[in-house]
Each structure stands twice: as C-alpha cells, then as structure tokens.
Curated annotation (Swiss-Prot):
Residues 6-60 form the HTH cro/C1-type domain. GO terms for molecular function: DNA binding. Keywords: DNA-binding, Transcription, Transcription regulation. It comes from the Bacteria. The keyword DNA-binding applies. Pfam families: HTH_3 (PF01381). InterPro entries: Cro/C1-type_HTH, Lambda_DNA-bd_dom_sf. Residues 17-36 bind DNA. This is Uncharacterized HTH-type transcriptional regulator YqaE. It comes from Bacillus subtilis (strain 168). The lineage of its organism: Bacteria, Bacillati, Bacillota, Bacilli, Bacillales. PANTHER family: HTH-TYPE TRANSCRIPTIONAL REGULATOR ANSR, TRACRIPTIONAL REGULATORY PROTEIN-RELATED-RELATED.
Length: 116
C-alpha cells in the first residue's frame, strides 16, 4: 500500500523519482526501491516524504485521507470530550469547548454544501 500511495502522490505533485531523491538526499535507485516496495524508508525519511508530498503519514501508510482521520478524531471527541478537549491541567475550559463547537459547526456547513 505504501509504495502505491507514494508513487501516486509523487505523480500528483508532478515530481520525478530523481526530484524526490534529490529532495530526500538519497540516490534515485534508493528512492525507486521505495516505490517498488523492495525497501522501506526509515521514520525520519518517511516524515520528510510526507512533508514533501504534503500528505499525512496515515495516507501514505494506510491510504486514509486526512478527512477520514479528522472524522475519527471528531468521533473520539464526541464520545469522550473531556479526554480529548482537556487543557494541560485536565480542565475543559469554555474556550476549548467554544473552539470545538466552531470546528464542528464549520464541518457541518461544509458537509451540507457538498450534499446539495
């Protein structure tokens, strides 16, 4: 899955394998091995790839879009808001609740627009 997603994202950014290798500071054959699935990047390189291609690690590794990741996090917040919205001292402040409400409201507006 990673190798397929890597190749797809690189092509969407209109980058060559050589471009990617140069940006990562590795040889083209080393980069090509990532796309062929015969070699896996270390964690630092994986993060660099994610940044260069402007995609999440979840998308690169599992094919999950940022929207899917956001939805999963939103479900966690709705199911247990105190855990996910707590400030450092463990208290859920009015400001945190207001910010969460604004985010949810914006997401609902966007969803309604796309449903029309």
């Amino acid at each position: 899955m990673f190798s397929e997603n890597l190749k797809k994202c690189r092509k969407q950014k209109k980058l060559t394998q050589q471009n990617m290798a140069d940006k990562l500071g590795i040889t083209r054959p080393a980069y090509t091995a990532y796309e062929l699935g015969s070699r896996e990047p270390d964690y630092k390189t994986l993060i660099n790839i994610s940044n260069i291609l402007d995609v999440s690690l979840d998308y690169l590794l599992k094919g999950e879009s940022n929207e899917k990741v956001f939805q999963d996090e939103a479900k966690k917040v709705l199911n247990d808001p105190e855990t996910f919205l707590a400030a450092k001292d463990g208290e859920v402040t009015d400001e945190i609740l207001q910010a969460a409400l604004e985010i949810i409201t914006e997401q609902l507006k966007e969803r309604r627009k796309s449903d029309k």
